[in-house]
Amino acid sequence: MGIVIQHNKDRLVRPKQPLSEDITLLVKIYRLPGSKCSTAPFNKVVLRRLFMSRTHRPPMSVSRMIRKMKLPGRENRTAVVVGTVTDDVRIHEIPNLKVSALKITRRNRTRILKFVQIMRFVGLALAAPNRQKSVLLSAPRNARDVSRHFANAPSIPHTKPYVLSNKLRRRGSKLTYNN
């Protein structure tokens, strides 16, 4: 018998444009040919993150952003988050920060506006095209509850199965495949 060569899995598929229409104008600015925005490596990373789905653009809490911006060498820099910035009620005092994000939650916006200077991505692209004084931040992608379900095979410990009923959950050892 011969070897079957399947070429349908050869090519590496990358998103070339965003699925959402809301981000399309931002992509046009960051792709603008001949401008400083299209050549800077920082902007290429931002452009690639703009294409990503919402699961790959997880929300970042204010507490995590504050913790990341307190690291040495990051004072007086702009925190760039390609995603949503959410509120954290455990934080009472927010230090002075400059933030550029796609979206800031409504409850968070009223609280943050007192302490934080918020820039849109369009303003960030026009203000400093080469991004010398900015830090690109991202939240952990596997922090979602759903990622526990597709971590391991069903018989491995700490796997969270999709349970149809609790009877099946109690009989879990009988339902798994054993050699």
Swiss-Prot record:
Keyword Zinc-finger: no
Keyword Aminoacyl-tRNA synthetase listed: no
Primary location group: cytoplasm
CC annotations in GO: cytosolic large ribosomal subunit; rough endoplasmic reticulum
Pfam families: Ribosomal_L18 (PF17135)
Gene Ontology MF: a single term: RNA binding
InterPro entries the UniProt entry points to: Ribosomal_eL18, Ribosomal_eL18/eL18-A/B/_CS, Ribosomal_uL15/eL18, Ribosomal_uL15/eL18_sf
Described function: Component of the large ribosomal subunit. The ribosome is a large ribonucleoprotein complex responsible for the synthesis of proteins in the cell.
Quaternary structure and interacting proteins, as annotated: Component of the large ribosomal subunit.
Protein name as it appears in the record: Large ribosomal subunit protein eL18
Organism: Salmo salar (Atlantic salmon)
